[in-house]
């Protein structure tokens, strides 16, 4: 190890801790001011146009209802068109002036291009792109008999949002709009039996962190970290996993989560953790990852 690295190894931790001790009070005060300002100057989405992927159930469905209550025009995207029609009907009753339903798979490039184009053709603009579509599977990595079986998870959770974002950016720049990425605390720290899901969400988080810098100030980026949410998933392995976690934390309804998320988006937050205690997992994984390590049980 050369002398420069030795010096950095000694000095940087000391300087960093000292800086944080001085900076943190100012940071907390600044965030408090931002919160107060956000409450007073919350974005009004009445008359704005919003695309929501994965909106046939779970958080995506209730995000659609929340935007509808606030008077937004909606494009709902998912693979189950029959369910989308049901959600769309309720959105109209809740106050959305018009709702477009587009059957599509976000892991398919041409589908992403199509639902963005159809939105512009119908509404003439785009203000919010909500990348919510995602899939999960509770499985030990070594239990995959075919490694290609992991591709649907990665393609939907990471590449899907990337594709949709690529086609949406030119339109979002015109309206100074926002990109919303529904990620997961699993992207911060490892979750046993969900290695591929966690990796796809970690990639998603880092992509949008970088994109926020590249697009600032023309387009805003909000990354969402939902906790344990009741989303109607019927996968038995995922239900068992959720049941294990529910012994430790409370499962929040998708409706409550969606309301908090849209509030955060409209206040211009860069991150929305719901419930808010979820952000503690980030600090634990960064400062003391040993606390999050436990031997997973095999069924």
UniProtKB/Swiss-Prot annotation:
NADP(+) binds at residues 54-80, 105, 197-201. Gene3D superfamilies: NAD(P)-binding Rossmann-like Domain. Substrate binds at residue 184. NCBIfam families: PRK06181.1 (NF004825). Keywords: Lipid biosynthesis, Lipid metabolism, Membrane, NADP, Oxidoreductase, Signal-anchor, Steroid biosynthesis, Transmembrane, Transmembrane helix. It comes from Arabidopsis thaliana. GO terms for cellular component: membrane. The active site is at residue 197. PANTHER family: 11-BETA-HYDROXYSTEROID DEHYDROGENASE-LIKE 4A-RELATED, RETINOL DEHYDROGENASE-RELATED. It is a single-pass type II membrane protein. The keyword NADP applies. GO terms for molecular function: oxidoreductase activity. Its EC number is 1.1.1.-. It comes from the Eukaryota. It is found in: Membrane. This is 11-beta-hydroxysteroid dehydrogenase-like 4A. Its main location: membrane. The chain crosses the membrane at residues 10-30. GO terms for biological process: steroid biosynthetic process. Belongs to the short-chain dehydrogenases/reductases (SDR) family.
């Amino acid at each position: 190890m050369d002398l420069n690295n030795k010096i950095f190894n000694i000095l940087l931790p000391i300087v960093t801790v000292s800086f944080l001790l001085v900076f943190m009070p100012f940071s907390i005060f600044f965030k408090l001011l931002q919160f107060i300002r956000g409450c007073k100057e919350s974005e009004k989405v009445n008359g704005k146009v919003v695309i929501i992927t994965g909106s046939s159930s779970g958080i995506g469905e209730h995000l659609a209802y929340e935007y509808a209550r606030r008077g937004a025009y909606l494009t709902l995207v998912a693979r189950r068109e029959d369910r989308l029609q049901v959600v769309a009907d309720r959105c109209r009753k809740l106050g959305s002036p018009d709702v477009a339903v587009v059957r599509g798979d976000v892991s398919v490039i041409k589908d992403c291009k199509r639902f963005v184009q159809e939105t512009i053709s119908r509404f003439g603009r785009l203000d919010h792109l909500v990348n919510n579509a995602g899939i999960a599977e509770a499985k030990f990595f070594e239990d995959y008999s075919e490694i290609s079986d992991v591709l649907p998870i990665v393609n939907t959770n990471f590449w899907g949002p990337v594709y949709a974002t690529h086609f949406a950016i030119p339109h979002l720049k015109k309206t100074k709009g926002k990109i919303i990425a529904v990620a997961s605390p699993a992207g911060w720290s490892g979750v046993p039996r969900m290695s591929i899901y966690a990796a796809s969400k970690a990639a998603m988080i880092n992509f949008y962190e970088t994109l926020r810098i590249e697009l600032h100030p023309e387009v805003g980026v909000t990354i969402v970290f939902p906790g344990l949410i009741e989303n109607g998933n019927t996968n038995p392995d995922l239900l068992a996993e959720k049941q294990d976690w529910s012994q430790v934390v409370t499962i929040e309804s998708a409706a409550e989560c969606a309301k908090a998320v849209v509030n955060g988006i409209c206040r211009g937050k860069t991150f929305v953790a719901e419930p808010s205690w979820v952000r503690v997992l980030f600090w634990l994984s960064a400062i003391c990852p040993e606390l999050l390590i436990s031997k997973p049980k095999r069924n």
